[in-house]
UniProtKB/Swiss-Prot annotation:
Gene3D superfamilies: Metal-dependent hydrolases, Urease, subunit C, domain 1
Protein residues bound to N-formimidoyl-L-glutamate: Y140, N315, G317
EC number of the protein: 3.5.2.7
Lineage of origin: Bacteria, Pseudomonadati, Pseudomonadota, Alphaproteobacteria, Sphingomonadales
Name by which UniProt lists this protein: Imidazolonepropionase
Cofactor: record remark: Binds 1 zinc or iron ion per subunit.
GO molecular function, one term: imidazolonepropionase activity
Binding site for Zn(2+): H68, H70, H238, D313
Gene name linked to the record: hutI
Organism per entry: Rhizorhabdus wittichii (strain DSM 6014 / CCUG 31198 / JCM 15750 / NBRC 105917 / EY 4224 / RW1)
């Protein structure tokens, strides 16, 4: 059987099914950017490849997926980091005009080209560790023009680098100063102008919101979900990070792809997510960076069978992190996730959190040939080692 590329003498973690899907003597064959075969060499058809590589026992996993980032932004929040170290809370900083609003000012001042220029090094850091798909949110423009500018910048990242980009409109991220005291008026803008414009221009793959005391109420979040659904866009939600407003349950009832953060998630929210198949995206970098003490209810999520993804949450204020390898280690050490859960969290469950489970996230025939090839002895090394990048080769769409 003819194929474009063949990788042999490899060990595979296909991530298919519920475990790692380990194959000790494996082969991956691809043609036209799609996987033809991924499995035991003994069961492989007789392939006639245009290009074959012998991997000498290296491991192949699916390309890694970062399903929650805020890569596109200008400015930094190093000064706020110092304030937090001195005892100021995230809420206190936000209410004093810092936080998201300070990044908003810098992002509004930057043009699209500058935003791309600033985001590329962050994206490159993820790519260097095997990422083949990255979600990128807006949310620092908070006007129609500036949110669309951010989404265009996100699309341009995918043109500048060999990586899949999923752009998420996060217009309901914070209340801009010009709408102080009029959150409902700002939500009107998001629902009536921002979401329709992003959908009309094909700039957004999903819509997100920040349901929190310093963000938007459940009723306002529901309006955002309704507008997204009317525009034909799936939804996601920042929920239960700082308090429990029952946002995860609201998201699940709206059929959300994922609910993210979830430190304050309760049993009702877990049950709703399990019923809906909504992915729990945990963000250990933010938990670590803002020195949270309340852990997400991992045992409850496990018991209910809720799929768990993990992501960097790369952003300037609460998780200036651009390493999925470190994120996996944090997921294990801080949240007590297993190695299998961490690896699933940046592959098959991350794909599901983006609605891409039929396309990426596992090594299976018909899926995009997105691979990460590693110089390791066992998959646990990807979670165990700190400050270590054993990536040998990254393949995106067969190239």
């Amino acid at each position: 059987m003819r194929c474009d590329r063949l990788w042999r003498d490899a060990r595979l973690a296909t991530m298919a099914g519920n475990g790692l899907g380990i194959v000790e003597d494996g082969v991956v064959a691809a043609s036209e950017g799609r996987i033809l075969y991924a499995g035991p060499a003994a069961d492989a058809p007789a392939f006639d490849p245009d290009r074959a590589e012998t991997l000498d026992g290296r491991w192949i996993t699916p390309g890694l997926i970062d399903c929650h980032t805020h890569l596109v932004h200008a400015g930094d929040r190093a000064r706020e980091f110092e304030l937090r170290l001195a005892g100021a809370s995230y809420e206190e900083i936000a209410r004093a005009g810092g936080g998201i609003v300070s990044t908003m000012r810098a992002t509004r001042d930057a043009d699209e080209a500058r935003l791309v220029e600033l985001a590329l090094p962050r994206l490159d850091a993820l790519i260097a560790e095997g990422a083949t798909t990255v979600e990128v949110k807006s949310g620092y423009g908070l006007t129609v023009a500036d949110e669309l500018k951010m989404l265009r910048a996100a699309r341009r990242l995918g043109e500048a680098r060999p990586v899949g980009i999923r752009a998420t409109l996060l217009g309901a991220h914070a209340l801009p100063p010009e709408y102080a005291g009029d959150a409902d008026g700002y939500v009107d803008l998001v629902c009536r102008e921002m979401i329709p414009a992003a959908a009309r221009e094909g700039l957004a793959d999903a819509v997100d919101a920040f349901c929190e005391g310093i963000g938007f109420t459940p009723a306002q979040t529901q309006r955002v979900f309704d507008a997204a659904r009317a525009a034909g866009l799936p939804v996601k939600l920042h929920a239960e990070q700082l308090s429990n407003l029952h946002g995860a349950k609201l998201a699940a009832e709206a059929g959300a792809l994922s609910a993210d953060h979830l430190e304050h998630l309760d049993a009702d929210g877990i049950a709703a997510m399990a019923r809906a198949g909504t992915v729990a995206t945990l963000l250990p970098g933010a938990y670590y960076f803002v020195r949270e003490t309340k852990l997400p209810p991992v045992d409850g999520l496990r018991a209910a069978g809720v799929p768990i993804a993990i992501a960097t949450d790369c952003n300037p204020g609460t998780s200036p992190l651009s390493s999925l390898l470190l994120t996996m280690n944090m997921g294990a050490t801080l949240f007590r996730l297993t190695v299998d859960e961490c690896l699933a969290g940046v592959t098959r469950n991350a794909a599901r959190a983006l609605g891409l489970q039929a396309e990426i996230g596992t090594l299976e025939p018909g899926k995009s040939c997105d691979l990460a090839i590693w110089d390791i002895e066992r998959p646990a090394e990807l979670v165990y080692r700190i400050g270590f990048n054993p990536l040998h080769t990254r393949i995106w769409k067969g190239l």
